[in-house]
């Protein structure tokens, strides 16, 4: 089993971490850089609204490396998570989203096996204690949600991963898939950016 313990994290930049993972090919690391960048706009797993660097005579800072976010475990500990998207492609064109279909930005997709391997490699090297995973919607909400569930399921059942997992529920996914995700994730969250129907029609006309 991958047994969790409490390492003294050295918050290195994403590139420094990746340079030390020799088993990963360059293509996977390029995709990871793109998808970690896209994931940073999801504020549900942000350290705080404050950017505060280390100062002489003071301990700590609020700035982690690329692809790393801070969250709080059930026991109150602040833990470091690999924060990444499965893909930043999306069938929707929501005006509020950086990853909307019409936006001109680098796109990438990690396979389930690639993301599982990345998580395990980072975890074994004590750079993270868990995973925060979200995704753009590809093909359909259920197709996308099923892939998120497969990542969590493979981590738990195949690799005996005992770290923290936070999954973002895909809007429109079936209740069955969301329930299955809850079997493997420590935390599930959903986006509620637009509480009124008229605002939804204005900003995301393809959703209902």
Locations of the language-model features?
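Residues in and immediately flanking transmembrane alpha helices
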Residues: 44-50, 96, 181, 199
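Core AdoMet radical
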Residues: 100-115, 122-148, 154-175, 182-208
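Short, glycine/polar-rich helix-capping loops at beta-to-alpha or helix-loop-helix junctions
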Residues: 90, 175-178
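Local cysteine-cluster metal-coordination motifs and their immediate loop/turn environment
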Residues: 88-100
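Flexible, acidic/Gly-rich N-terminal and inter-domain linker regions that tether
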Residues: 1-89
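N-terminal, well-ordered alpha-helical segments
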Residues: 79-83, 92-95, 113, 117-120, ...
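Short, flexible, glycine/charge-rich loop motifs used to bind or transfer phosphoryl groups or to couple energy/partner
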Residues: 69-72, 121, 178
